[in-house]
């Protein structure tokens, strides 16, 4: 149908369609000029939830997001006469989405999230009309979507030892909350990570590695205070167990340096005087200190 014939159809519409409801014209009018968008939109969850006909015009169909369509119709189109998300500032896009999604998304958390603060709008990640991932209406598969901005993380997931995101065994959102988390930072690194709650422990890691949760009678302070990332990379590493160093003892000696049997001023145990670190027998610390994340039996994590 060409543009002239489309507009000819509007001449046949009842005047009441434009006169009532403060400029709301109904989604069937939108369908006349936007048949391609309509053909995909009516199949997705948004359409199902807002096109039931049980809600008032401002919460029904296309106009629940794009606003009253009368001026847009009378002007024969144009982004200046309708709520057009492609030109809307990110904070305004968020306001529109939160009209419905405020129950599932915390207004405070999402407004202070690093995505929002860096100008990432809802439609930067979500494809509202048509989506390759219908469950969350994502514009792409989740990992590909995240890699679009976080290319450095894509490289880490290609390392020999990594969390298996590319293989489909887990997703970015298993650890990260893209809409903002209760904890503004991932405590162990002190950098914004938008992860789920981290109250007293490293919750993103412990969701899977629950055996490391504790509490233990004898805590390894670096685990409890500074966190998992002090020893492990979170995404990928050239070292087994995602360790930050290729040899275990070099990692341990970053804290347990000095000689003699005792403690440093900060309370950290020094390297044992009986351990000759040039001897390969002493270079794999965890061969003896097997409960390195914490123990209920031994202060030196020997069992």
Range-by-range predicted roles:
Residues 2-10:
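Sec-dependent signal peptide recognition
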Residues 3, 18-303:
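Short sequence/structural segments immediately N-terminal
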Residues 11-19:
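Hydrophobic h-region of N-terminal signal peptides that target proteins for export
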